[in-house]
């Protein structure tokens, strides 16, 4: 039976490349499949004791590394676009598109873990001895992703030594690590971009002053309502809760308190960047802030998916080797991996915590005509 979607030969453009036996060769050459498909060297086979699941292990990790390369490629292009004083809406749209691509890739990587879990612990044990001293900790590309995203060296969990020491005397790897540490990370560039959010200017709309005033009014209304509470215990509880909220707001309104939290590692953004992020969150329905809000949401998605990938990896490792054995690279294995699930590895932590500082929609300072005109132009 012929293909129902194929037209007859008379319908084809004379300039079209004819199908022939050379098509497969061209395809293979373009993708360099001879190298790609010949890169699965099973050490168990070299030892004349082939283990079937070692092939799956190699393929899965090679697929990870290929996708890591694409993520780095996208991050580098996004960083180039963000590294400018003015970012027009066309570039913002492109940044959003590429961040969304990274999100979809990471979802794919998270979903790859269950494929590895089709291998039983006993299957893994059959070839694990061939892996040492190799370790996932030695994935240069994953370290570059972390650095380009904005994971700080001081935030990293110690792994017997500095994370770059595992690359030994590999100058290419060490130079790549140093370059990723020295160049502006996505976090730094997003921070600069947020600091330039229109409407933050003290001599303009001055969102921050208006926001503080709205918070004061909101808390005053809460206190007034609490004082009308007839049950003394309930009243005291509500007043205590309001005071706690007041302290939370004070941590963003007092620059010194904010800076102390940054130094302690509890916050990442500068004070100005935090103001910009809050303003974009409040006015995300305004056309000018729609794309920036999408951008911030995608950054959170990336952080979340990397955390999910780490978590899935941790659970898989525990299933394969338990929680007491050392990793093949000499790390504490499960214990080390579990420690990377903390907020210290969450680059855009401040975006996740923005909901802490929300106020009711009706209390959000309305945009005046001057700022609306500025946002349009």
UniProtKB/Swiss-Prot annotation:
It holds the Pfam family Trp_dioxygenase. Its cofactor is heme. Pathway: Amino-acid degradation; L-tryptophan degradation via kynurenine pathway; L-kynurenine from L-tryptophan: step 1/2; Pigment biosynthesis; ommochrome biosynthesis. GO terms for molecular function: heme binding; metal ion binding; tryptophan 2,3-dioxygenase activity. Binds 1 heme group per subunit. Heme-dependent dioxygenase that catalyzes the oxidative cleavage of the L-tryptophan (L-Trp) pyrrole ring and converts L-tryptophan to N-formyl-L-kynurenine. Catalyzes the oxidative cleavage of the indole moiety. Homotetramer. Dimer of dimers. This is Tryptophan 2,3-dioxygenase. It comes from Drosophila grimshawi (Hawaiian fruit fly).
């Amino acid at each position: 039976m012929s293909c129902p979607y194929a037209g007859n030969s008379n319908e084809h453009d004379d300039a079209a490349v004819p199908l022939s036996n050379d098509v497969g060769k061209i395809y293979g050459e373009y993708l360099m499949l001879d190298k790609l498909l010949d890169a699965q060297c099973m050490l168990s086979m070299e030892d004349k004791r082939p283990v079937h699941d070692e092939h799956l292990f190699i393929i899965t990790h090679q697929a990870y590394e290929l996708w890591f390369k694409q993520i780095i490629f996208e991050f580098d292009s996004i960083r180039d676009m963000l590294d400018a004083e003015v970012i027009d809406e066309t570039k913002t749209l492109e940044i959003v598109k590429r961040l969304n691509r990274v999100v979809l890739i990471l979802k794919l990587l998270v979903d790859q873990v269950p494929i590895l879990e089709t291998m039983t612990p006993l299957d893994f044990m059959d070839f694990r001895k061939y892996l040492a001293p190799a370790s996932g900790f030695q994935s240069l590309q994953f370290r570059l992703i972390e650095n380009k995203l904005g994971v700080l060296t001081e935030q990293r969990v110690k792994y017997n030594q500095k994370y770059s020491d595992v690359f030994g005397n590999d100058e290419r790897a060490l130079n790549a690590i140093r370059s990723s540490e020295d160049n502006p990370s996505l976090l730094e560039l997003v921070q600069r971009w947020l600091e330039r959010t229109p409407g933050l200017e003290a001599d303009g709309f001055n969102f921050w002053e208006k926001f503080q005033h709205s918070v004061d009014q909101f808390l005053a209304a809460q206190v007034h309502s609490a004082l009308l509470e007839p049950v003394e215990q309930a009243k005291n509880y509500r007043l205590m809760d309001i005071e706690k909220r007041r302290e939370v707001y004070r941590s963003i309104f007092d620059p010194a308190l904010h800076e102390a939290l940054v130094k302690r590692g509890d916050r990442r953004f500068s004070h100005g960047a935090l103001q910009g992020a809050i303003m974009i969150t409040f006015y995300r329905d305004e056309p000018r802030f729609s794309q920036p809000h999408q951008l911030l949401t995608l950054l959170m998605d990336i952080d979340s998916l990397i955390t999910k990938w780490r978590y899935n990896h941790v659970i898989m490792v525990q299933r394969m080797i338990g929680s007491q054995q050392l990793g093949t690279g000499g790390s504490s294995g499960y214990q080390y991996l579990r420690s990377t699930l903390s907020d210290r590895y969450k680059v855009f932590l401040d975006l996740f915590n923005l909901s802490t500082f929300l106020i009711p929609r009706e209390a959000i300072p309305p945009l005046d005509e001057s700022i609306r005109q500025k946002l349009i132009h």
